[in-house]
């Protein structure tokens, strides 16, 4: 992919501008893409249908919350949880570049990032907990 005159992000000879996803991130990326396709996409229309009939336009319909909680449980069970955290103990140890590829996939579906515990403001709060939280707080919240 060209990003300017003579600059290609996937050109292996240009190490200073290598913006390709690392080989180590590929399995997680593939798992996220698969999860979105098989778990998130099939319930997205229902999620939006429920949102259109909610009483509180500042909150979620109870059915929407149920959909999200079920997706979150499945994601956590598959290990697709907190992978945006750079620390390999609490996250996947991804670089910002590798996470960018995954975030791009999350951005294609309006409920994907929430389903995989990667949406604001939660991500920022978890980053703080990762850095300064007690072991007990990390165990409970991360």
Task: Name the predicted role of every residue range.
Residues 119-126:
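Short, conserved phosphate-binding/catalytic loop or strand-edge motifs used
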Residues 1-119, 131, 136-140:
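Amphipathic, small/basic residue-rich leader segments at the start of a protein or domain
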